[in-house]
Amino acid sequence: MEHPKQPKRESLKTLWREKRAVTLVYIFLRTSVLLVLLAQIFNRNFENVFLCVLTLILFTMPSLLERKLDIDLPNTLEIIILLFIYAAEILGEIGAYYVTFPNWDTVLHTMNGFLCAAIGFSLLDILNRNSRVRFHLSPLYLAIVAFCFSMTVGVLWEFFECAMDQFFFFDMQKDTIVHDIGTILLDPTGGNHPVVLRNITDVIVVQADGTKTALGLGGYLDIGLMDTMEDLFVNFIGALVFSIIGYFYVLSRGKGKFVKRFIPVANDTVSQENTTSGEETSL
């Protein structure tokens, strides 16, 4: 008598063998998020409840992309993506790591630039290896497009942060205290000549009802410009680093072991590589 469920069992065993590290990390992070979710429900902090639910949804994205695009994500890349989501949403927002650790946001944006360049690079590399696609990009163009893809994602994210700040006052674009500013709005002639104010030590806010409040911050409050520029710059660094690494990876015909940990491949390519290695072993 045949057992129709046997192939499924075998496939689960294979999946566990190949994705053991990813599965363990996923279970640990998901359990942690669920515990945080219960705590936030108990505290009636529904904004954080939403962040927890969003995190759980984002955790499913890597496996969803693998199924929909018929690709295989390297374990290292998948684990980093999961840790990145957890670090940004749970630790950063709910755990207030953005405030506790001043460079937390900078590190995440650098990782974002690196990861997005890897994803953009891999998508083009998959198309390059597909015989049904009628164009073929050189290694240099692959690197340039991957870099541009990563920077575009970074810019779109800054648009999102700005929208959240404007409409919901989330303060996602973190503030910076500056001591010198230059602005044409203070030009007494109404011209285009910037007036420079130096050594600012405090700012007094006057509200519509006449209430005056000295902020006592020790300088002028910049409400996001410096943070946005820093985020885009470190995104640029991350994207540039991976684009250079990816360029040499393609030149060497995919022999770099380090880069392979970050570049998804089409499943038919994986099958071909496994078949080839099997033939070499038998010989």
Model segments located where?
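Short, highly charged, low-complexity non-transmembrane loops/tails of multi-pass membrane proteins
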Residues: G256-S277
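Membrane-interface helix-boundary motifs at transmembrane edges
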Residues: L65-T76, R132-L137
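Structural signature of hydrophobic alpha-helical transmembrane segments
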Residues: F42-L56
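Short, Lys/Arg-rich, polar N-terminal cytosolic tail immediately upstream
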Residues: M1-K19
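Cytoplasmic-side transmembrane-helix entry/capping segments in multi-pass membrane proteins
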Residues: V53, D72-L83, T106-H109
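Membrane-interface helix caps and helix-loop-helix hairpins in membrane proteins
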Residues: I41-F46, K68-I71, I94-W104
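Alpha-helical transmembrane segments of multi-pass membrane proteins
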Residues: F59-S63, F84-E89, A146, S150-W157, ...
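Interfacial helix-loop-helix junctions of multi-pass membrane proteins
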Residues: I94-D105, G154-V155, F159-F242, Y247
